[in-house]
């Protein structure tokens, strides 16, 4: 639902939220739209945080007829469960308001989509669509998109006709849009939406890569058998059937006229008939005499034109029937001119069907729908156990369906409707992040994994039994390595869902801390039911889930494919820069053992309840909790500041690649077209180089942010434990200073969460851009994928990223720090821009500290069990591959101390200058006062 500003003429009572910030089990956020008699707010579930739309109607403003329409809408929506109809979750009535809790549709309505069709490239959820199906100037939507939406609208209308419903107000404003299922399941930035049933977010028709359409606003809908006629004037005049405008009796075919007007507007970008009132509109319809003309500039296929003309017949008898409409080739046939990414991929469905257990009918229906959605064919009905939450696929009478008492609040934890996802092959870690192979609603997992209700509380569904049943093999696969087999065996032991683990940890921890100190946690641990340890697989943080007892046996290899040359290049650069700036050489083997990117945000520490303070957080002295909180806050801020410095450096690269960074500030529009062409000036080699540099820097920033969250996790665990115990520090814990520090930590954690999610998205954009640019290089180019078949083949089931030799975050950061220090030194000598010099020195220090980053710097040193060879080997490998030698650290630390000395001298110099200026100003003021005392005064002192 598109955001709209409140009218200045609206009364304060209309602008006021219906309750004190909550309606039933939902919290009201902000107003996102309004109608003649209702306001629409975005809201979220108190427990899961899933988004909903809350339609709040003030009863005092409704007359008897409008109240009947409202209660009729509620009655109808309670009985309807279809993927392409906006579902009603709940209805909460108070003394002054009726609040309808409905599905949230992030992309607004179809009218906004059509209006902003030339600016879809600026929205993250529609950017890929605009690239695959570009829209020419002064034309409507691309025909592929038009047919896709028409198929989904037809699916909703077919369901309504089976229940003898007529909507009577089909128009673009009542057709709401969600991001495509593929976008929701592969992008962490997608918002988590509360689903009404297991398949309410799974399209029944169309393409899974395009936005999902849902029919809304049943205020004028009614049950109307095919033999009955109605005579009420309702709906929007611009899309009304002529028989309604003539005040004649009408039947369900009135909806077909409205479908024709919507289809015409999608194809051309404008409605077929424009008028200021319904009388003038009727006159224009009559004058056209069924001759529907299309603009010359619009490219519309003859098949689509024929369907529009069949729908826009003045006489309902001559108008196409529902049966013919639902069986029309545009509805039932495949969508032509599909992009290669949307072409249907053949799957051995018959083999799967023959071995599928009987209890998995709902899953086979889902697979069937997905397979047919690519070709645009409606799914064929399959018998299955009836459920009040399920989409009726037989011919039901909706009025006879009685939903359960809380049926509207059914929630699918998996994100794509069934609560079950296909388990991906376990992927070994690689030199660069790889694309996740999970098909999961990652946004949903991000904020609800730690708060997911027990499985026993979920409404029983036949598909749930699949989680524990062995899955038959559908086709032969290549042999797995021993490590992959072991990882898969352990993964199959758990009845959990594969999720973006690190993103979940960051968001879940931030959610937990955000509730403090408003409510004291009831447990000493952070609940992480659906999160496991695993290997990093992509810059977006997706990881393969595995049991906690399965230790990681391999480590990320350095990004360079030729370690010798890389070390030489880095060492030479460091020595030359150090000699120029500081007059001494750094050890030649500096950073030779470092990783870039490091082991990406190594799995969240396997110490949910540590028994001792973390090494970095505690100095071994016995101090009060307040002092400890102060150290924690400072430590978290330090790591966050280092990540911010690296992020700023990565942004320099990113903005050269994407001149206008994706931003929700622009919504679906607002980006000048000329700015979108700036990236065309980059050569392929430059694009590859910038993408590689931006990628490793973003990954480095992510690792630093993850360390901040690790420290916050330890603090939060200890804080939660102390809150549930009668410790001697209970008084200090409740002190004002302690609460203030906790709030400070909370603010920092929320900032880290926001930055973490932003960097994940940008890293994925850069990764895709890098892969695309590498494919366009000449085949003999060293960076072309064909020259790295060995490396790429090691990434199971994912598209690997191969970086050029010599690319590492540490080298880039070191060179940048040296450059900034040198520039600051030159300006300091010339006494130019001293505040800028201070910023440059501080940034260089933070960047060099980030170069010194070690995965275990901030973590407690855990003992190595003498009875576990694996743990000993793991510790040895970590010490050999992840940590710098003491000589390397001393060299960098010496450099940091020298830059700090320069910074201290600069600050003293700036302080002296400031004091001199203040003294000079005071002297001037005193002179003026003395001169003023000698002048005659008109007012006595």
From Swiss-Prot:
Keywords: ATP-binding, Autophagy, Cytoplasm, Kinase, Membrane, Nucleotide-binding, Protein transport, Serine/threonine-protein kinase, Transferase, Transport. Residues 530-551 have a biased composition (Polar residues). Pfam families: ATG1-like_MIT1, ATG1-like_MIT2, Pkinase. It is a peripheral membrane protein. One of its GO terms (molecular function) is protein serine/threonine kinase activity. Residues 26-331 form the Protein kinase domain. It comes from the Eukaryota. The keyword Membrane applies. InterPro entries: Atg1-like, ATG1-like_MIT2, Atg1-like_tMIT, Kinase-like_dom_sf, Prot_kinase_dom, Protein_kinase_ATP_BS, Ser/Thr_kinase_AS. Its EC number is 2.7.11.1. One of its GO terms (cellular component) is phagophore assembly site membrane. Homodimer. Forms a ternary complex with ATG13 and ATG17. PANTHER family: NON-SPECIFIC SERINE_THREONINE PROTEIN KINASE, SERINE/THREONINE-PROTEIN KINASE UNC-51-RELATED. Serine/threonine protein kinase involved in the cytoplasm to vacuole transport (Cvt) and found to be essential in autophagy, where it is required for the formation of autophagosomes. Involved in the clearance of protein aggregates which cannot be efficiently cleared by the proteasome. Required for selective autophagic degradation of the nucleus (nucleophagy) as well as for mitophagy which contributes to regulate mitochondrial quantity and quality by eliminating the mitochondria to a basal level to fulfill cellular energy requirements and preventing excess ROS production. This is Serine/threonine-protein kinase ATG1. The lineage of its organism: Eukaryota, Fungi, Dikarya, Ascomycota, Pezizomycotina. The gene is ATG1.
């Amino acid at each position: 639902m598109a955001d709209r500003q409140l009218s200045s003429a609206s009364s304060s009572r209309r602008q006021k939220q219906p309750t004190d910030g909550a309606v039933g089990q939902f919290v009201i956020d902000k107003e996102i739209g309004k109608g003649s008699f209702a306001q629409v707010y975005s809201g979220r579930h108190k427990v899961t945080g899933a988004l909903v739309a809350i339609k709040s109607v003030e009863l005092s403003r409704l007359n008897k007829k409008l109240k009947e329409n409202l209660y009729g809408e509620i009655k109808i929506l309670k009985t309807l469960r279809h993927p392409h109809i906006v579902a009603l979750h709940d209805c909460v009535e108070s003394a002054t308001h009726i609040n309808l809790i409905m599905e949230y549709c992030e992309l607004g309505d179809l009218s906004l989509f059509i209006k902003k069709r030339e600016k879809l490239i600026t929205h993250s959820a529609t950017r890929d669509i605009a690239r695959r199906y570009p829209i020419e100037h002064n034309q409507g939507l691309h025909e592929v998109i038009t047919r896709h939406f028409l198929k989904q609208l037809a699916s909703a209308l077919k369901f309504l006709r089976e229940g003898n419903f007529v909507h009577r107000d089909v128009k673009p404003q009542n057709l709401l849009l969600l991001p495509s299922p593929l976008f929701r399941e592969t992008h962490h930035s997608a918002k988590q939406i509360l689903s009404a049933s297991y398949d309410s977010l799974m399209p029944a028709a169309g393409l899974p890569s395009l936005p999902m359409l849902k029919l809304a606003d049943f205020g004028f809908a009614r049950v109307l058998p095919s033999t009955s006629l109605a005579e009420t004037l309702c709906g929007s005049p611009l899309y009304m059937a002529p028989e309604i405008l003539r005040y004649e009796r009408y039947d369900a075919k009135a909806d077909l006229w409205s479908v024709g007007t919507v289809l015409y507007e999608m194809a051309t970008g404008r409605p077929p008939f424009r008028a200021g009132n319904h009388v003038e509109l009727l006159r224009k319809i009559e004058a056209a005499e069924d001759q529907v003309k299309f603009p010359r500039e619009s490219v519309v296929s003859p098949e689509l034109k024929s369907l529009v003309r069949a729908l826009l017949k003045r006489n309902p008898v001559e108008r196409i029937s529902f049966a013919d409409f639902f069986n029309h080739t545009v509805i039932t046939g495949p969508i032509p001119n599909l992009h290669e990414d949307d072409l249907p991929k053949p799957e051995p469905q018959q083999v799967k069907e023959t071995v599928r257990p009987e209890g998995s009918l709902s899953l086979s229906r889902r697979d069937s729908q997905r397979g047919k959605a690519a070709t645009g064919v409606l799914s064929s009905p399959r018998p299955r156990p009836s459920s009040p939450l399920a989409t009726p696929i037989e011919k039901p009478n909706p009025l006879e369906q009685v939903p359960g008492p809380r049926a509207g609040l059914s929630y699918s934890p998996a994100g794509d409707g069934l609560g079950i996802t296909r388990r991906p092959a376990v992927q070994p870690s690689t030199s660069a992040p790889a694309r996740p192979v999970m098909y999961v609603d990652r946004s949903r997992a991000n904020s609800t994994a730690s708060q997911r209700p027990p499985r026993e509380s979920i409404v029983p569904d036949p598909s749930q039994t699949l989680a524990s049943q062995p899955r038959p093999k559908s086709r032969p696969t290549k042999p797995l390595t021993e490590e992959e087999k072991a990882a898969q065996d352990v993964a199959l032991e758990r009845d959990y869902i594969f999720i973006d683990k690190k993103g979940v940890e960051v968001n879940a921890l931030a959610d937990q801390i955000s509730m403090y100190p408003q409510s004291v946690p009831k447990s000493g641990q952070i609940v992480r039911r659906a999160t496991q340890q695993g290997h990093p697989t992509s810059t977006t943080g997706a990881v393969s889930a595995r049991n906690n007892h399965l230790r990681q046996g391999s480590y990320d290899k350095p990004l360079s494919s030729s370690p010798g040359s890389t070390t030489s290049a880095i060492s030479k650069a460091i020595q030359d820069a150090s000699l120029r700036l500081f007059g001494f050489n750094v050890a030649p083997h500096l950073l030779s053992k470092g990783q870039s990117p490091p082991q990406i945000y190594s799995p969240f520490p396997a110490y949910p309840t540590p028994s001792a303070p973390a090494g970095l957080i505690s100095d071994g002295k016995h101090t009060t909790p307040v002092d400890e909180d102060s150290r924690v806050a400072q430590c978290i801020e330090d790591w966050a500041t280092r990540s911010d410095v690296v992020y700023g450096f990565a942004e320099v690269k990113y903005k050269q690649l994407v001149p206008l960074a994706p931003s929700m500030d622009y919504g679906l529009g607002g980006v000048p077209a000329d700015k979108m062409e700036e990236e065309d000036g980059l050569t392929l080699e430059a694009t590859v180089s910038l993408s590689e540099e931006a990628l490793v820097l973003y990954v480095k920033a992510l690792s630093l942010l993850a360390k901040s969250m690790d420290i916050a996790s330890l603090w939060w665990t200890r804080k939660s434990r102390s809150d549930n115990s009668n410790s001697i520090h209970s008084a200090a814990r409740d002190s004002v200073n302690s609460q203030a520090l906790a709030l400070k930590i909370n603010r920092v954690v929320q900032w880290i969460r926001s930055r973490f999610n932003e960097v994940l998205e940008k890293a994925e954009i850069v990764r895709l851009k890098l892969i695309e640019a590498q494919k366009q290089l000449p085949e003999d180019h060293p960076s072309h994928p064909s020259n790295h078949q060995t490396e790429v083949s090691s990434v199971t089931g994912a598209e690997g990223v191969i970086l050029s030799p010599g690319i590492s975050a540490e080298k880039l950061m070191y060179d940048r720090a040296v450059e900034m220090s040198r520039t600051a030194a030159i300006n300091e000598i010339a006494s130019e821009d001293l505040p800028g010099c201070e910023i440059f020195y501080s940034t260089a220090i933070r960047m060099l500290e980030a170069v010194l980053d070690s995965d275990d710097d901030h973590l407690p040193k855990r003992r190595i069990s003498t009875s576990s060879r694996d743990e000993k080997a793991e510790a040895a490998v970590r010490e050999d591959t992840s940590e710098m030698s003491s000589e390397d650290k001393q060299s960098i630390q010496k450099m940091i101390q020298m830059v700090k000395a320069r910074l201290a001298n600069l600050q003293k110099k700036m302080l002296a200058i400031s004091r001199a200026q203040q003294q000079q100003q005071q002297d001037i003021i005193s002179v003026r006062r003395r001169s003023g005392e000698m002048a005659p005064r008109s007012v006595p002192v």
